[in-house]
Design a protein with these regions (language model features):
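Domain-scale detector for complete catalytic domains at protein termini or as standalone homologs
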Residues: 1-134, 138-281
Length: 281
C-alpha cells in the first residue's frame, strides 16, 4: 500500500511537471513593440531585460519567478512585469534559472550567485536596486539575499517577497488548517525534495527560514491567509519583526498580487498597489 502511494505521488508529480512545462508561455508580442527588450546569455542561461521606452526611472528590479522550482515563466508573470514597468518606470531583469528535477539548488546558485554579483557591480551607486520574487522565486530571493549578506556584497535597497515559499519541508502544523484552493501539499513537498537534492533540506539556500537574519533590512512580505505558504511566512516575519514588514490579506489566495484578472477584489488591487508604492517610495 505504501509503495502504491509513492508510485501514485510520482505519477501526479510527473503530470503537474509536464503541465507546467507545456503551459509555459512565449514572450508576448507587445513586449517587443512597447518596451525596450533584450535577451542575453549568462553561463548558458537566458537573461531577459525589459524596461520602458520612455520615462525610465533609476530603478532596477531583479525578479525571480515562481513555479514550485519546476515551472517556468508564465504569461501572468509577463503581464505583471508590464504593469510594474508602466506604473514605476523600472527596468526588470528576469533570469531563466535552472529548474528541478533536472537541477537542484546547487546548480541554481552556481548561476544566481555570480549573476547577482555581476548585476550589483554594474549598478550605479545611486540606482535603487530591488530584489523581488513570487512563491518559490520569493524563497530563492530571500536565500540569495542571505547568501550575499554573508559574502558582504551590496544588498538590495528593498526586497519584496510575494506569497513566499520559505520552507519546502512543509512541516508547520498550521499548514493543514489553511483552506488553500490552489496549492497541494504532497506535490509541493515532492517538488521541494527534488529541488533540495540529497542533503539540501538542511541548507538555508533551500529553506531560508534556517538562514542568517542579522543583515536583513527593508524586507516586505505580502501573503494571503488562504495560501498554505502563509504560516511559514508569518512565523518568519514574527521572529524578525524589526526587519521584516509582513503585509497580510485575509482570504487572499496564493500569488494574488500577480493575478491581474483578480484585481477587481479589494485585497488583490490593494496588494498590487502596495508593491508599486514600495518600489517608488
Amino acid at each position: 500500500m505504501i509503495i502504491l502511494f509513492f508510485v501514485l505521488l510520482a505519477f501526479l508529480f510527473a503530470i503537474i511537471y509536464y503541465e507546467m512545462r507545456v503551459a509555459t508561455s512565449k514572450l508576448p508580442k507587445d513586449v517587443f513593440k512597447e518596451y525596450d527588450f533584450s535577451q542575453e546569455k549568462f553561463m548558458k542561461r537566458d537573461i531577459f531585460i525589459i524596461s520602458p521606452k520612455e520615462d525610465k526611472k533609476n530603478i532596477v528590479i531583479l525578479y525571480l519567478h515562481g513555479g514550485s522550482y519546476v515551472g517556468e515563466l508564465e504569461k501572468y508573470h509577463w503581464n505583471f512585469f508590464k504593469d510594474i514597468i508602466n506604473d514605476t518606470g523600472a527596468a526588470i531583469i528576469v533570469p531563466d534559472y535552472p529548474l528541478a528535477p533536472e537541477n537542484t539548488y546547487l546548480q541554481v546558485f552556481k548561476i544566481m550567485e555570480p549573476l547577482y554579483k555581476k548585476i550589483v557591480q554594474e549598478l550605479n551607486e545611486h540606482t535603487e536596486f530591488i530584489l523581488m520574487g513570487d512563491s518559490a522565486g520569493a524563497g530563492l530571493s530571500l536565500a540569495l539575499y542571505q547568501r550575499n549578506g554573508k559574502l558582504n556584497h551590496r544588498l538590495p535597497n528593498k526586497t519584496i517577497l510575494i506569497s513566499p515559499w520559505l520552507d519546502v519541508r512543509m512541516n508547520n502544523p498550521e499548514i493543514d488548517n489553511v483552506k488553500d484552493p490552489i496549492l497541494k501539499k504532497p506535490l509541493l513537498k515532492l517538488s521541494g525534495q527534488k529541488y533540495a537534492g540529497k542533503n539540501g533540506l538542511k541548507s538555508y539556500l533551500v529553506n531560508p527560514v534556517l538562514g542568517p537574519t542579522d543583515k536583513l533590512r527593508n524586507i516586505y512580505i505580502l501573503s494571503g491567509t488562504n495560501d498554505m505558504l502563509n504560516p511559514d511566512a508569518k512565523k518568519f516575519s514574527l521572529l524578525n519583526n524589526d526587519k521584516v514588514k509582513f503585509i497580510e490579506y485575509d482570504g487572499a489566495i496564493h500569488n494574488f498580487v500577480l493575478m491581474k484578472h483578480k484585481r477587481t477584489t479589494v485585497h488583490a488591487k490593494d496588494g498590487y498597489n502596495k508593491v508599486v508604492d514600495i518600489i517608488l517610495n
